[in-house]
A protein has these predicted regions:
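Catalytic and substrate-binding clefts that recognize carbohydrates or anionic sugar/phosphate headgroups
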Residues: 1-160, 167-169, 173-174, 180-185
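Aromatic-lined carbohydrate-binding/catalytic grooves of carbohydrate-active enzymes
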Residues: 48, 154-269
Length: 269
């Protein structure tokens, strides 16, 4: 059981005797064992209280309150904000009841916050051991304690918290400058113009150079945007095909990511 300093019950592990439905049998806090290879993974099951709200687990575009959701805490390309996948998952969450949990694992985890059973939060972890940090207090205290463990980021410049103007994608110097002019003319106050994949010579294939046929003078463009009060962000992708001029340097220098069997990791190269 987790209780606060005044003895209030915050949450507790669920056991087989806690089943409160005659029809639906919820597995208690357990290990899941696979017959194929005898491996195990842990499945912590905790109480989820009425009106409890859960926040965290990283960047996602679903509802801020995760109760009622099944959150996949693993890196995927969500292909847009309409899905529940995450570029930046974080195995940490906190509750409005005054506690937070950091799952100290890099293994894929599925957090079922009352999605399949409203009275339980179920953590399906791809790990044989459970290493949890549990924090107590108001949200600001929980976050402060969590970052005491994982590290605190420095305060970013004020402009980074402003509006970033982007799309997939601005393909030319003139298009970027035109967007900047229209934003100022219409008194829309963004701080950043972001060029997605379209600034490369070949879309999606990052060679860290502006396409010469579409960006005639990128230095002048950057100076113009800076004069108008814009910061410029350039999208980058650490993905190199054999035709990329940096490919051989990457492979020969031992900088490429390899699969477990030693072969190069690739998609459609």
């Amino acid at each position: 059981m987790l209780r606060d300093g005044q003895g209030k019950l915050l949450t507790q592990t669920r056991h087989i005797i806690d089943n409160d439905s005659t029809q639906v049998k919820l597995l208690p806090f357990n290990f899941i064992k696979r017959g194929s290879d005898n491996s195990r993974s842990i499945n912590p099951v905790l109480m989820l209280s009425p009106n409890e709200r859960i926040y965290g687990c990283g960047e996602s575009f679903t509802s801020l309150n995760k109760v009622g959701q099944k959150v996949q805490i693993s890196v995927v390309d969500p292909q847009g904000p309409e899905t529940d996948g995450m570029y930046k998952p974080v195995p940490f969450y906190f509750s409005n009841r005054g506690y937070g949990i950091f799952m100290h694992t890099s293994a894929p985890t599925t957090a079922d916050f009352g999605a399949s059973y409203i009275g339980a939060q179920r953590l399906f972890m791809g790990d044989e051991t459970m290493d949890f940090f549990i924090f107590f207090g108001e949200p600001k205290d929980v976050l402060n304690a969590y970052t005491d463990v994982t590290g605190k980021s420095p305060m970013l410049p004020l402009w980074t918290f402003g509006t970033w103007m982007s799309r997939i994608t601005y393909f030319s110097q003139e298009e970027g400058l035109d967007i900047a002019r229209k934003l100022r003319a219409n008194k829309i106050p963004p701080d950043v113009i972001h060029f997605d994949t379209g600034w490369f010579g070949v879309d999606w294939q990052c060679d860290y150079e502006f396409a010469k046929d579409r960006f005639k003078d990128p230095v002048a463009m950057l100076k113009s945007m800076k004069k108008d009060g814009f910061h410029t962000c350039l999208w980058q992708l650490p993905y190199f095909t054999p035709k990329n001029r940096y490919f051989r340097e990457l492979v020969d220098g031992g900088m490429a990511v390899h699969n477990g069997n030693g072969t190069l990791s690739y998609e459609d190269a």
